[in-house]
């Protein structure tokens, strides 16, 4: 049930439309899955799914789960990164950003990772995705989910957006701000959203959202685009928030929210929710419960200037080459924890046996404790040599990619400047030398499994 404050406010704003707009077509919260293009095309998934789904109106890769008792998070496709379990309307915002391969993309408030996984799919392994989460525990969940989804080109940060703006001014071609909000679209999904809801929370979230928007604006390059979204209905966090932002930032214009896609959904914004400030509410979008989702608000903002030219597919800019070189130089300064003790070279038979065992462990996944147990047995040079030998046998397409050693493990880095930001992951940890053999990481297979030359058809 909605709170007394919420219902009083919304009835005053909507009048006799209140009951119709908030009348959801189902008794329980809508459930859906969003298919990752890194794994499968939506049509392929729809043809092979062994549970009932129907296409979502909010996203071409989205599907509504028709059985309310079905739990997508327990399905093998979930664990394989084929889809992300996501409330249907939550999948609406990311595609509207118009992300293309080669872009630099920032997701400012990314946990648990659903929208970041959509952005990663749009990048198709080309370019850079920086997924940030301020809360440390949620940032770890974000990192884990992006690994499960097989994202190869992500940097996961645990940072304040103000520090990101200071470190990376006008760096990104696209920015998504799915702002922390009062969660009025979560009332049916999470009981805590109702119990903690009050007018003070709305005002607090609106102030925080304004701060994050200002920081995001500083991160966005000239000619870049930004999507602002919430899962709430509060005017201060939606139309009023966007209208106030445009007053503070004349370098931005409000663009048609559907300018990057060939479909539409939901309803226009509401003119009586702008706080008296000018705003073309036909350019923003609301999703009401009666439209099949739990609720969302979306606006698209464009920064003045000429967009950055994107690098050719599969290439790096000169600047990005320097960042990779700096990462390699930093790697050379590390020392093996055993003082450079040579790793024991196994004979051919044991090498094959250990490699097969390592592959099984990688596919099944290992705990951080298991992963770290043998790290540091080899010097960085020995670790890189072991990786290259392993890659030539199992992943020849990766053998010549830049690789560095970080914390005893081999990392395929993404081009990212050294900023002093709190980085949880910057690329793909492919494995480490343990007990004289190279032990691959699970992320290697989720990110690059299709490149493995020793796999079942």
What do these predicted ranges mean?
Residues 1-171, 203-208, 255-281, 285-287, ...:
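Glycine-rich nucleotide cofactor-binding entry segment
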Residues 245:
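Conserved catalytic/ligand-binding micro-motifs in nucleotide and anionic cofactor chemistry
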């Amino acid at each position: 049930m909605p709170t007394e404050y919420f219902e009083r406010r919304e009835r005053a704003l909507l009048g006799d439309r209140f009951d119709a707009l908030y009348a959801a077509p189902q008794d329980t919260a809508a459930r859906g899955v969003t298919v990752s293009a890194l794994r499968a095309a939506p049509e392929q998934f729809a043809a092979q799914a062994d549970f009932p789904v129907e296409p979502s109106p909010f996203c071409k890769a989205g599907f509504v789960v028709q059985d309310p008792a079905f739990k997508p998070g327990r399905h093998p496709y979930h664990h394989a990164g084929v889809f992300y379990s996501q409330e249907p309307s939550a999948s609406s915002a990311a595609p509207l950003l118009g992300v293309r391969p080669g872009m630099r993309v920032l997701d400012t408030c990314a946990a648990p990772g659903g929208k970041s996984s959509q952005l990663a799919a749009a990048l198709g392994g080309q370019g850079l995705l920086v997924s940030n989460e301020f809360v440390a525990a949620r940032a770890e969940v974000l990192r884990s989910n992006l690994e499960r989804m097989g994202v190869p080109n992500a940097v996961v940060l645990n940072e304040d957006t103000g520090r990101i703006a200071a470190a990376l001014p006008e760096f990104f071609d696209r920015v998504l701000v799915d702002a922390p909000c009062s969660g009025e679209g979560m009332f049916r999904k999470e009981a805590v959203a109702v119990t903690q809801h009050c007018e003070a929370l709305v005002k607090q979230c609106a102030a925080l959202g304004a701060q994050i928007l200002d920081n995001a604006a500083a991160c966005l390059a000239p000619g870049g685009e930004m999507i602002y979204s919430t899962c709430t209905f509060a005017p201060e966090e939606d139309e009023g928030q966007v209208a106030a932002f445009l007053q503070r930032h004349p370098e931005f214009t409000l663009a048609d929210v559907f300018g990057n896609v060939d479909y539409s959904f939901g309803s226009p914004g509401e003119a009586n929710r702008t706080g008296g400030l000018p705003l073309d509410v036909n350019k923003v979008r609301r999703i009401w419960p009666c439209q099949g989702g739990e609720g969302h608000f979306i606006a698209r903002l464009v920064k003045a200037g000429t967009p950055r030219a994107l690098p050719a597919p599969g290439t790096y800019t000169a600047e990005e080459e320097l960042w990779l070189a700096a990462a390699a130089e930093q790697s050379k300064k590390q020392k093996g924890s055993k003082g450079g003790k040579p790793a024991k070279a196994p004979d051919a038979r044991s090498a094959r046996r250990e490699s097969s065992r390592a592959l099984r462990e990688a596919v099944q996944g290992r705990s951080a404790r298991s992963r770290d147990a043998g790290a540091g047995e080899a010097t960085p040079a020995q670790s890189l040599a072991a990786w290259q030998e392993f890659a030539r046998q199992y992943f020849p397409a990766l053998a010549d990619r830049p690789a560095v050693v970080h914390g005893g493990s081999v990392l395929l880095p993404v081009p990212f400047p050294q900023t002093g930001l709190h980085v949880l992951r910057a690329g793909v940890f492919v494995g480490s030398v343990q007990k004289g053999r190279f032990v691959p990481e699970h992320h290697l297979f989720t990110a690059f499994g299709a490149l493995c030359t020793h796999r079942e058809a």
